[in-house]
Each structure stands twice: as structure tokens, then as C-alpha cells.
Amino acid sequence: MSQVDINHARALVYQLLSSLFAREVDEQRLKELTSEAAQQFWEQLSLEANFTQSVDKIRSTLNGIKDDEALLELAADYCGLFLVGTKHSASPYASLYLSGEDEPLLFGEQHQQMSEFLHQSKLQVQSHFPEPADHLAVMLAYMAHLCCHSEDSVQLSFLQTCVDSWLAKFINQLTQCHKNGFYSAVATLTLAWVKQDIAQLEPAVAVIS
């Protein structure tokens, strides 16, 4: 497999993870995530020991949805975790975990920084996704873009500074609210993927630095 193919595969994983944080799973998305091609993808991903438990939980949840009621329950989980700002939720915004303020505000420093990154890459948050730019879904989608359009050093710096710097805190909050749930598994898989990607990028960057 060429480096281009590897980077494309990495981008697909980041794009998938981004999509799961961006919106609830609807009927069309469920069909995509449980298709034959998707099953092969999940199977391949689960071969990595650090991903197995999370992938198995994700697959079993998706494959277990057989009616509208179960799909609505998963949508309710998404809404309760990510759209309602209470102590029983886990807001997916970097500023809430990186700011030193007692009550950090949305659209703050991390949002401005991420907006500038997007601007430099001639990208923008889509109008149908009215969220701050430091939303995890935006960051993961941007990383998917970097995989195919930027040097390894740029990718590594973004992952370490903008994603890995707060992801564990977010997941800790999420698992407290949603222990052993679908979105806890998605978040845990995201952290494991980011950690592995950093570990693979570091040697490559060290060689050329």
C-alpha cells in the first residue's frame, strides 16, 4: 500500500468518527454503517487490539437496531449527551476543556484558532452545522483533510495541540454520563485512534526534522 493510499485510509477513519459526533444516526446513516462494506471495515479495524472492545460495542449497537424505537433511543442519547448543556452531558467543544476560566464561553479562543486553520485551508464549517469551530466533529473532519493535503509535521502538530490536548478530559466526562454506551465506545475509539496516529507520525517527523 502506497503512502497516498495509507493517508486516504486514515482520512476515511477521521471522517467516519467526525460524522458520528456531528449528528445523530438516522435511518439512512444506519444503513450505511451496517452495509456489507461497513461490516468489512469494522472487522478490519477491530483487528487492532486497542480498538477491538470499542469497535465490538459500536458494531453490536448498530447491528442491534431493528426498529424505529431503538433508533430513536440512540438519537436521544446523542441529544442528551451533546446538545443539552447540563452536568449529565459532555459538550464536545475544546474550549470547555482547555480554557482556564471557571465558566468558559463558546466561540472563544479555541474556536477562533480553529476558524483560522479552516480559513488558511480555504475551508469553512458548513451552514447546516451551526456549531463553534472547536467542535470535535469539525476538528476530526479537518484532520481528515490534513491527512491528504499536509505534511506529516503539520498533522502531528495539529493532533497534539488541538485534539489530544483535551480529548481524554472529554472522554472522562462522557463515560461518567454514558458508561458502556455507544457514544462512549465511539469516543474511546477516537482517542485510541488519535494516540496510534500520533505514535506513527512521530518517527516520520523526527527523521526529517
Swiss-Prot record:
InterPro entries: Chaperone_TorD, DMSO/NO3_reduct_chaperone, HscB_C_sf, TorD-like_sf, TorD/DmsD_chaperones. It holds the Pfam family Nitrate_red_del. Keywords: Chaperone, Cytoplasm. GO terms for biological process: protein complex oligomerization; protein folding. GO terms for cellular component: cytoplasm. Transmembrane segments: none annotated. It is found in: Cytoplasm. Its main location: cytoplasm. Gene3D superfamilies: 1.20.120.1820, HscB, C-terminal domain. Belongs to the TorD/DmsD family. TorD subfamily. Involved in the biogenesis of TorA. Acts on TorA before the insertion of the molybdenum cofactor and, as a result, probably favors a conformation of the apoenzyme that is competent for acquiring the cofactor. This is Chaperone protein TorD. It comes from Shewanella baltica (strain OS155 / ATCC BAA-1091). The gene is torD.
